[in-house]
Amino acid sequence: MLDWRLASAHFILAVTLTLWNSGKVLSVDVTTTEAFDSGVIDVQSTPTVREEKSATDLTAKLLLLDELVSLENDVIETKKKRSFSGFGSPLDRLSAGSVDHKGKQRKVVDHPKRRFGIPMDRIGRNRLSNSRG
C-alpha cells in the first residue's frame, strides 16, 4: 500500500512540475492581479525570480523523491543473521552442525558396553533392551 502511495505522489509531482514548466498552472501573483485590475490580461507573463526559484525547488524535490523511490526499490535486507539459533527456532541441517557448545563441557567417561542379550528383531520395537544411544 505504501508503494502505491509513493508512486502516486511521485506521479502527481511529475505532472505538476510538467504543467508548471509549460506555464499552464494557474498562479496568482501581484503582477497578474494588477493586470486584471487595469483590464489588460497577459496570460503568458514573463516568469519572475520567485517563480523560477520555486520551479527549481520543485525540480530538486522531484529529483530527491525519485532518488528515494529508486532507493526503496533497491532495498537489500540489512539484518545481520545470527550465528546461533534463537530459542524456539527450528534447526536446519546446515546450522545444526555449526553450533559450538562452549558452555559446560562434560567429562567423557568410557563405560564398558553392557549387553545382556542381542535383540532378535530391531524393526518395530520401541526400545532396545539395555542399550544406550
Swiss-Prot record:
The keyword Signal applies. Belongs to the Osteocrin family. Hormone that acts as a regulator of dendritic growth in the developing cerebral cortex in response to sensory experience. Induced in the brain following membrane depolarization and inhibits dendritic branching in neurons of the developing cortex. Probably acts by binding to natriuretic peptide receptor NPR3/NPR-C, thereby preventing binding between NPR3/NPR-C and natriuretic peptides, leading to increase cGMP production. InterPro entries: Osteocrin. The modification Arginine amide is found at residue 132. This is Osteocrin. Induction: Expression is induced by neuronal activity in the developing cerebral cortex: expression is driven by the presence of a enhancer sequence only present in primates that binds the MEF2 transcription factors. One of its GO terms (molecular function) is hormone activity. It is found in: Secreted. Interacts with NPR3. Residues 1-27 form the signal peptide. GO terms for cellular component: extracellular space. Pfam families: Musclin (PF11037). Keywords: Amidation, Cleavage on pair of basic residues, Developmental protein, Differentiation, Hormone, Secreted, Signal.
